[in-house]
Design a protein with these regions (language model features):
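A translation/RNA-centric and nucleic-acid-associated enzymatic feature enriched
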Residues: 108, 178-334
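Class II aminoacyl-tRNA synthetase-like tRNA-binding/catalytic domains
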Residues: 2-118, 126-130
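Extended, charged alpha-beta segments that form solvent-exposed binding/catalytic grooves
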Residues: 103-189, 193
Length: 334
């Protein structure tokens, strides 16, 4: 059982008020995010076919939930994320540079190891916008991170105004740190402990350079080779004082161009993926240059509503021993 039990935990909101607050948080953040990044909400699939190449392979080992479709005889997969679908959708909808889309993404990750912040059910805002080739820079990435972080701070202010017994925790600014800098600072620490040290010091961190090899030969964390450019991506991490952890609330980046895709497919030894429809279209220059990411809805609610477990803000499945332990600890799972 992977479970942190905060000492003398007492939720700041009861079950019914929590449900009301979840709706308030999601509506406010979504509206502010769309305004900040110039995004239009669109509908999105919950399933794709394996041969489309559109599903997110995550770290490359997670198994998608799949099933056969009676009418067509096809196999369908529940999405892991919409990272690649969004880029294709931007072209389909005719978006222009500076414009983008977002959607409510619901996924099932059957191989997830659950704990206070991990669930087999994933709900996030998936967003993507078109950029120009000249905007494929760290400066563009950092400016977008700051806009998202400002939206998060506005949302925290909104929550605190509605529920005065919830006090603000977020620092005024987010700090940018590279995964290589963390390795240099803490070469003997496990990767997640490095993240913890950074957020414990700064409160809010954007950790860059996820997926590629560090000087030690290790990756800080896995990323599929065919959506983020590993040199232009990162995670938004917050210090959660209730759980005393580094809480990842967003993963985002500037997406691969043809050169980056070829390079990263070769590094991972999966050049055959270049023949899949999405990857082939990208290599042929048929898809726009984009940046995008996912922002965890339930994780944001865990943080802003001062919850101890993601199961307090979403309905999912949990092992019986976790259910029993949560009940004893006054953690009310939905």
């Amino acid at each position: 059982m992977h479970l942190i039990i905060p000492k003398n935990y007492n939720p700041v909101l009861n079950l019914r008020d929590t449900e009301i607050a979840i709706k308030l948080v999601k509506d406010f953040f979504e509206t502010e995010l769309a305004r900040a990044l110039n995004l239009t909400r669109v509908s999105a699939p919950i399933m794709v076919t394996p041969d489309s190449g559109l599903n997110d392979n995550l770290n490359g080992i997670e198994r998608p939930v799949s099933f056969d479709v009676l009418e067509t005889g096809e196999t369908a997969e529940i999405v892991h994320s919409l990272a690649k679908w969004k880029r294709q959708a931007l072209k389909t909808y005719g978006f222009q540079p500076g414009e983008g889309l977002y959607t409510d993404m619901n996924a099932i990750r059957r191989d997830e190891t659950t704990d206070n912040i991990h669930s087999i059910f994933v709900d996030q805002w998936d967003w993507e916008k078109i950029i120009t080739p000249k905007q494929r820079t760290m400066e563009t990435l950092q400016a977008t991170v700051r806009a998202i972080y400002l939206t998060l701070r506005k949302t925290e202010g909104f929550v605190c105004a509605h529920y005065p017994h919830i006090k603000p925790e977020l620092p005024d600014d987010i700090t940018f740190v590279s995964s290589q800098e963390l390795e240099d600072l803490y070469p003997d620490l496990p990767l997640k402990e490095r993240e913890y040290r950074a957020v414990r010091e700064y409160g809010a961190v954007f950790l860059t350079g996820i997926g590629g090899a560090l000087r030690s030969g290790q990756m800080h964390d896995g990323r599929a080779p065919d959506y983020d450019d590993w040199s232009l991506n990162g995670d938004i991490l917050l210090y959660d004082p209730l759980l005393d952890i580094a809480l990842e609330v967003s993963s985002m980046g500037i997406r691969v161009d043809p050169d980056a895709l070829r390079r990263q497919l070769a590094i991972r030894g999966c050049e055959e993926r270049a023949e899949l429809p999405f990857q082939k279209a990208l290599l042929n220059g048929e898809l726009p240059q984009t940046m995008g990411g996912g922002i965890g809805q339930s994780r944001m609610c865990v943080y802003l509503l001062r919850k101890a477990h993601v199961g307090e803000v979403q309905a999912s499945l949990w092992p019986q021993d976790v259910q029993d332990a949560c009940r004893k600890a006054n953690i009310q799972l939905l």
